[in-house]
Amino acid sequence: MTEKKNIRENEMFETAKALGRRELLKGSLALAATPAIVSTARADTKVTWKVQAHWPKASGSFNDSLAVLAKLLEERTDGRFKLELYGAGEIAKDREIYNVVRRGVVPMGTISPGYILGEAQAMGLLYGTPGTLRESWEMMHLTKNLGVEKMVNEELKPKGVLIMAEKAYPTELVLKKKITSLADFSSLKVRSAGTMLEYLAAAGASPQQVAGPEIYQAISTGVVDGAHWGAAVGALSMKFWEVAKYHMKPALGFANDAYIVNVAALNKLPPDLRLQFLALVEERYFLRTVEYLQQEARALTTGKTKMGVEVVPFPDEVMKKFGAASQAILKKEEAKGEIAAKGCKALTGLMSDLGYA
């Protein structure tokens, strides 16, 4: 009896072991399948971000910068990541865009760093210090390789915002009146923004802040005598040349436009979508800047040959005033703090290497 009992117990034990192995195998297979399920779920995730632009829909940059970014992002993510685009003022405009992005009202916007100079010590350098650099590639180098964008984000990220340069471009003034002297220039009221306000004021003009969609009317009705919105591309797309035929050279300076993103919204993206987005923005900065230079040449040719635009050099007296103003602005930027001083050192070092200082 004892022997039969032992046999039955052994049989039960072996059966239990077999059942245990089968259950363990089932569990293992289920566990192994989990990453695939998660992966499939992530692959199926679809995201649509509202993007508030500071560009009016008539602006060349709305279509050639933002709309192209949206198109490429949708293509590269197989339709999983879409951008819903809003022109200037549809949700917010100008300086307000930073706050609606920071608060998460919209996850993304475009902006001129000149609208938010007080948000980071090096923001003025990211916007562009008037009268310092002379080519777009120099601004690109300062922004990316010499670290100015990174310096700005050191202060913005803790506030919940990431800024990424969109393109570097020249800033040039268009005027209703032809000027030939410092006295002529000192009589002007001009629309401006950022550190360009101080730069123009130092040379005697009376700069004013006017929102993008309102600039054309301000020029045409005489509220201002001229404006800058980029350079030739902006003047053509915003129709400034219809009412202001004098295009001034050289450039007041070189600036960056930028994308701003809510950090929490960025971090919520599936890793693959986040990677695609960040890589595309970085790629587009270089491609768009170079493309913009060709568009500048085409736009200015159109203005001169078809619209009666005249390219006018700034009088020597005005250029001397600009030179002094540039140095004063640079000193003010440097005095903003340790981060700003580091950025100014990078800028002045570059200028020295280029023979500008």
Description of each model-found segment:
Residues 142:
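Mid-sequence acidic-hydrophobic segments that form the walls
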Residues 1-5:
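N-terminal acidic, proline/glycine-rich, low-complexity intrinsically disordered segments
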Residues 8, 13-38, 42-138, 147-357:
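N-terminal secretory/targeting leader peptides
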